Amino acid sequence: PGNRVRAVWRARLEEHLGHFQIEPDELSAGHLMEDPLALSGLNAACAMASACLPEREAHPAVAEAFEVLIDALETPELWPALYVRWEAGLLADLGYGLDLRRCAATGQTHDLIYVSPKSGRAVSGGAGAPYKDRMLALPGFMHGAGDLETGDVAAGLKLTAHFIQRRVLWPADKQLPDARARMIERLEAAGAL
C-alpha cells in the first residue's frame, strides 16, 4: 500500500478470472514505512476503502481524495484532519453524505456545533441544546467554520464512524476495520487527537 500503479485488467469475459498488467507510477511506500503514524493512517484508509466500497464499482472522487491523503501522510499535523474529511467524502460518494451546511431545525448557517445522529444534518447550538446528550459533536473544520482545535480530529472520527457503521457497514454485516482502531490508538499516543 502507498505506491501508485497503473493497472490494466484483462479477461476474455467479465466473469473470467483474468489477469492484471501493473506498472509503477509513483513509489512512496518506502517513505511511509519509516513513519509508524503515517503508516497506520495509510493502513486505516486502505482497510476502510476495502470494507466500504463495493467491488467492480468506480469511485473516482474517493480515489482522487485517497491520493491527496497519501501525499499528506508526510505532514503529521495535517493528515489526521484530512483523513476525517476523506471518510466524510467516502460517505458522500456512497450516497450517505452528511449535510453540514445549515441547521436542520432553523436553517441558520452559523453556530453549527452538533450533528443529528439520525439524519446526519447539522444542528445549531441553540436548537440542539435540549438534545445535546444525544447529539454528535461537529468539529468546525468539517464545515469550514474555524481552524483545527484540540479534540476536533477525535470528534470527527467519532462522527464519521457513527454514520459509516450505521449506513454502510452494519447493513452488510461488517464492522469497522481493526486498522482504524489501531490508527486512533497511535494518534492518541502521539497526542494528535
Please name every model-derived segment.
Residues P1-L193:
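Non-catalytic alpha-helical scaffolds and adjoining flexible linkers that form interface surfaces
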